């Protein structure tokens, strides 16, 4: 008989090959969001580069054991981490995301929130929150709850959207509660009991185009609800000189993260924090 991951007591093994919650919650995320992302993740420069930065960050700050990718959507990040040699459990409350993750071949998928799963206190070695925290109404309480689930010395890895001035209709549609600065993310992590080990901005070249092409049109009421076509256009890389410039910019940024350097501007924040080990 299979044992649920993380000592979870609120899960049952479903007929579709993944763990499911015995009860379900309401999500701050559009019902079709996972399917929209699934259709463009593999061809998106943004998702690909974020994965590369996450993998590099885990190499610099290795997890002490299995990483639980909380709110991990379709398993794009979890699949990349597994391929890079980091054992990963996907924890995704959306049914479509869990099913898409299974299609990607992930071995351990949990269709539940962390509360629904009932993970045991001090049981998780590492947690990933990749563009998840901005969806949570009370981010401090959520981080504190995750802190209680982690073993001393465990690490949490995060990405979040940056700068409230870059707010647009995409944030509204995605169910975001806020965007962060380095200082605000560091503050909430510390208040939750974590020691921040690394915190940088990333996608350093995107704030200006996002401001001009998303934020301003949204303020003026010109920006429409994102759809498959608009999302594909924004996430695809162009050929020629423009594509070369984007790839150079991404490569430069990746090299800085590999050396643990801090970037002072970007459309996202990338962070690593640790639950303080027991003294002695």
Where are the language model's segments positioned?
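A short His-aromatic
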Residues: 131, 135
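Short, glycine-/aromatic-enriched active-site segment of Class I SAM-dependent methyltransferases
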Residues: 38-40, 156-190
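A structural helix-start
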Residues: 136-140, 160
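A SAM-dependent methyltransferase catalytic signature shared across enzymes that methylate proteins
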Residues: 186-200, 247-252, 274
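Short conserved AdoMet
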Residues: 62, 137, 151, 194
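Conserved catalytic loop of SAM-dependent methyltransferase domains
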Residues: 36, 76, 198-250, 264-268
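A short glycine-rich, Lys/Arg-flanked "PGG" loop and its adjoining helix->strand segment in the class I
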Residues: 140-155
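Conserved N-terminal segment of class I S-adenosyl-L-methionine
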Residues: 1-122, 126-130, 140-143, 240, ...
């Amino acid at each position: 008989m299979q044992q649920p991951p993380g000592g979870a007591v609120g899960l049952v093994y479903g007929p579709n090959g993944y763990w499911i919650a015995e009860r379900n919650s309401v999500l701050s995320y559009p019902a079709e969001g996972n399917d929209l992302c699934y259709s463009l993740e593999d061809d998106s420069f943004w998702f690909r580069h974020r994965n590369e930065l996450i993998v590099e960050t885990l190499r610099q700050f290795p997890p002490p054991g299995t990483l639980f990718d909380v709110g991990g959507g379709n398993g794009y990040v979890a699949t990349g981490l597994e391929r890079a040699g980091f054992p990963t459990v996907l924890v995704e409350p959306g049914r479509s995301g869990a099913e898409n993750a299974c299609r990607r071949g992930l071995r351990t998928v949990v269709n539940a929130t962390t509360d629904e799963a009932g993970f045991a206190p001090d049981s998780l070695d590492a947690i990933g929150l990749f563009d998840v925290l901005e969806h949570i109404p009370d981010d401090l309480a959520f981080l504190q709850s995750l802190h209680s689930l982690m073993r001393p010395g465990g690490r949490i890895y995060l990405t979040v959207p940056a700068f409230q001035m870059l707010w647009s209709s995409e944030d509204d549609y995605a169910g975001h509660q806020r965007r962060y600065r380095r200082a605000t993310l560091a503050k909430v992590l510390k208040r939750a009991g974590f020691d921040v080990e690394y915190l940088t901005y990333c996608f350093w070249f995107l704030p200006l185009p996002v401001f001009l092409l998303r934020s301003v049109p949204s303020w003026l009421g010109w920006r429409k609800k994102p759809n498959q076509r608009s999302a594909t256009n924004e996430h695809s890389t162009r050929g020629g000189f423009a594509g070369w410039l984007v790839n150079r910019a991404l490569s430069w940024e990746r090299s800085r993260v590999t050396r643990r350097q801090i970037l002072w501007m970007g459309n996202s924040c990338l962070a690593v924090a640790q639950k303080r080990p027991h003294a002695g």
